[in-house]
Amino acid sequence: MKIELIIYVYLFICTGMIAFNIISVFVYHRRDIKTTRISRGFEETIKTELSNIKNGESVSENHLNYMTAALQREANMIAFNKVMDRICEADSQTVKAYLISLESVFVTVSEKYLRKDEIAAAYFPYIIGRYGILSEEPPEQIVRMLFVLLDQPSIYSRENAMQAVYTTGNTEYVVKALKNIDRGNHFYHSKLISDGLLRFKGEAAALQKKLWEEFETFSTEMKVTLLNYFRFSSGEYGDRFLTLMNDESQDDEIRFACIRYFGKYFYKEAEQALVFYADCDNGLREEYCIIASMALALYPGEQTVKTLKKNLGNRNWYIRYNSSASLEKLGMTYLDLIDIIEGNDRYASEILRYRFDIRNVIEEEREEESPNE
């Protein structure tokens, strides 16, 4: 009897799930139909305004009032997004002028969305950020809303708010937002920040200057994030990175970020320090040796090769791997390293054979592909 009861309960649950899925399909389909209908209405009126802008006219007051009333509903905001997604590429300059004219509309509806649930509230800055609706001096009301969202526990709210801040091109707002995140209690992945900074709509040089001015006011974690941003954006800060890298009072993570910077951008003055960090007998943490061994791929020289060859016999696999990769990038051939490959150090011999095996496989694949080109 117990088994039969369990089976009946299981069948009841399965039936309920199937019914739920069927109902959901119908509900979502009906919602899509409604959104499509609203989108068509938006598209007609928006295209009329775009035509007026092309003729040198401004967006009509009636249209602004209509959009103010319509965009207070989430379904209409979704429909608006679909319309703009379709027409944005048609005439970007005219569309940009139209979107900027909607700034007053978004000021009015911002307070409405701030009082909605976190998903709806997060969608508002998403639209602002996606279409670059804000100017460099955005309305205070919207800025205030964005900074409120930066303190929300939802990562969607915080990330979308940051994306909207980046589109303003205002360095003051970006730095202020970064400080809010830095002092907040919510986790914010560093890659989201560094990638977001790369999408900053203003002058990158102005933003970088401002970040360096405020650099010491940030926590260690945020400093590392900013250093990563500099690594991805500019090779003009070798002197600053060298000073930080050689400053023993700095946190290790900051110095690691500096070593990675010199692994991306050649800076002659950093070569001697990198050789020192790549020496596994320097008394420092192993991470220095691991990262510096990879960075030395940009610094050909007798001392570099000597240090990397020595590292091939290290017990740490990452040190061996990075050293072998750097030697390969420096142009070392099988014959150049034959003494190690055929030597008694099994660690060094195996990692080099591994590297050359990989290279041979890649070369064979290229040869097979070349006749078909």
Protein language model features and the residues they cover:
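N-terminal signal-anchor transmembrane alpha helix of single-pass membrane proteins
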Residues: 1-39
